[in-house]
């Protein structure tokens, strides 16, 4: 999940500042539990809440990284996989994946009930019979400055707040976990959501480059190329359009009698064809072609021809979310455009809030606080920081790609992912995308994954799956079941 200023248990008002170093010791609190799986089997497991010590370039303690691991004792001769999970932001803890997806406990958020204004009671944490624990051990990691992860260096978190810095920290943390738990021979998977996919692309290459094999990378709601978002470029307009079309279809604005995937397929063709050609011509486009594109765009997105004419074919996500349902006095969500809400100013140009985020944050945060204390018995040293949204202004967005001659001002980590796959041909990639996600539109992911520059023999290692859901694919029952099935099959598959 991208960092949200509303999602906070003990929100940080500003990035973590320099502080006196704490004792450089790793903590571990271990508890035993039993999960009843969907098949009725009893699965004993261990939950470990603890910290991993990260060292700086001088070998001194630099940060303490918090994690929660769920492990099952292997059978004789078994090498159980281990999967490392993290959310994104940058500046988000792993609370969302941890509490709402594949762990042995889950907050069953009801998207439909929570999405209606005033609808839905707060769900309670419960055992998760569909947990992936029967398939893989799981480790949920919090980035430095989030969760209970803290900087120990006198410079505070500045050493960790950047693309390359963050990737180096997670690489070190994963290696440290593998070392202290003797998981060298275990199949290893990375599971990142949102900016976590950015992290996974970089970390996969760094781990492989350091001699640690990575068997698979799972990308949920990807953002791999920040350079596409630079002002003046048309690529993101093209990338958003199929998601606009899916949203308009869901809310009954277009596509009567047409299925979602058929409507989205038409939007893909239009976006990559006539729409891309029109944007490339800029002000040189002819009047007849312009009107033809406007008419097609209106039929796909549900926006009026007059509005598209005034917008000159360029519609930002916040403008779209406000305009689509303006006649109903409603605004759609951004993380999940199926959600709707109301705002005080219906005449505003852009959406000022995100109903999708507002609907889910409270339930997950409240349950997590109780779970840590009562079930895991973890006594923290301070507050759990769910999100640190103010990391954005101080984040170092530059990136040195593998073999690159210079630092790029804006990261394109598709380069890293492609390099990792070429370097380690056994590594597979599973991409998971939601049609109703305007935070990381699926068409942008398609573009990036089509530019990994893989030899034909490796193309089969790249698998893409799509769902009628938003950014956080695990937040409604039907999609959660589909995603769980696909991830379980991916991890369980035998290497070829």
Give residue spans per PLM region.
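N-terminal cap/lid subdomain of alpha/beta-hydrolase-fold enzymes
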Residues: 12-17, 59-159
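A catalytic-pocket lid/entrance helix-loop region that shapes and gates access to the active site
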Residues: 104-108, 206-302
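Alpha/beta-hydrolase active-site loop
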Residues: 133, 143, 160-178
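Alpha/beta-hydrolase fold nucleophile elbow
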Residues: 183-194
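Glycine-rich nucleophile elbow surrounding the catalytic serine of serine-hydrolase chemistry
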Residues: 192-205
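Alpha/beta-hydrolase fold catalytic core
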Residues: 284-439
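Active-site-adjacent alpha-helix of alpha/beta-hydrolase-fold enzymes
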Residues: 438-461
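Catalytic histidine-centered segment of alpha/beta-hydrolase-like enzymes
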Residues: 468-479
């Amino acid at each position: 999940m991208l960092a949200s200023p509303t999602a906070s248990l003990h929100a940080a008002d500003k990035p973590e500042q320099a502080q006196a170093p704490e004792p450089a010791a790793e903590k571990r609190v271990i508890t035993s539990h039993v999960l009843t799986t969907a098949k009725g089997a009893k699965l004993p497991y261990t939950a470990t809440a603890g910290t991993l010590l990260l060292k700086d370039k001088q070998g001194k303690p630099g940060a303490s990284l918090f994690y929660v691991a769920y492990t099952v004792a292997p059978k004789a001769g078994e090498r159980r996989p281990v999967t490392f999970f993290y959310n994104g932001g940058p500046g988000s803890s792993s609370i969302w994946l941890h509490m709402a997806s594949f762990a042995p406990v889950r907050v069953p958020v009801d998207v439909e009930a929570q999405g209606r204004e005033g609808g839905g009671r707060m769900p309670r944490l419960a055992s998760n019979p569909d947990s992936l624990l029967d398939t893989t051990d799981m480790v949920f990691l919090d980035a430095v400055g989030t969760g209970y992860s803290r900087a120990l260096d006198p410079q505070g978190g500045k050493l960790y707040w950047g693309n390359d810095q963050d990737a180096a920290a997670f690489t070190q943390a994963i290696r440290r976990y593998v070392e202290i738990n003797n998981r060298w021979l275990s199949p290893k998977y990375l599971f990142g959501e949102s900016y976590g996919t950015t992290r996974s692309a970089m970390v996969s290459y760094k781990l492989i480059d350091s001699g640690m094999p990575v068997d698979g990378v799972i990308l949920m709601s990807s953002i791999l190329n920040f350079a596409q978002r630079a002002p003046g470029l048309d690529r993101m307009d093209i990338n958003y359009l199929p998601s606009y079309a899916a949203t308009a279809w869901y809310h009954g604005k277009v596509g009567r009698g047409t299925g979602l995937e058929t409507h989205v397929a038409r939007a893909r063709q239009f976006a990559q064809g006539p729409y891309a050609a029109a944007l490339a011509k800029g002000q040189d486009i002819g009047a007849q072609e312009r009107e033809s594109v406007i008419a097609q765009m209106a039929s796909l997105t549900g926006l009026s021809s007059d509005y598209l004419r005034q917008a000159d074919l360029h519609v930002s996500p916040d403008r779209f979310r406000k305009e689509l349902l303006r006649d109903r006095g409603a605004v759609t969500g951004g993380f999940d455009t199926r959600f709707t809400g109301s705002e005080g100013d219906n005449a505003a140009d852009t959406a000022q809030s995100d109903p999708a985020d507002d609907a889910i944050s409270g339930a997950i945060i409240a349950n997590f606080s109780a779970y840590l204390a009562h079930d895991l018995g973890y006594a923290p040293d301070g507050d759990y920081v769910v999100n640190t949204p103010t990391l954005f202004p101080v984040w170092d967005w530059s990136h040195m790609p593998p073999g690159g001659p210079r630092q790029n001002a804006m990261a394109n980590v598709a380069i890293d992912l492609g390099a990792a796959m070429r370097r380690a041909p056994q590594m597979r990639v599973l991409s998971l995308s939601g049609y109703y996600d305007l935070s990381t539109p699926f068409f942008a992911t398609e573009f990036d994954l089509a530019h990994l520059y893989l030899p034909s023999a490796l193309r089969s290692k790249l698998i893409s799956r799509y769902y009628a859901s938003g950014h956080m694919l695990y937040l409604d029952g039907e999609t959660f079941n589909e995603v769980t099935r696909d991830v379980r099959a991916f991890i369980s598959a035998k290497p070829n």
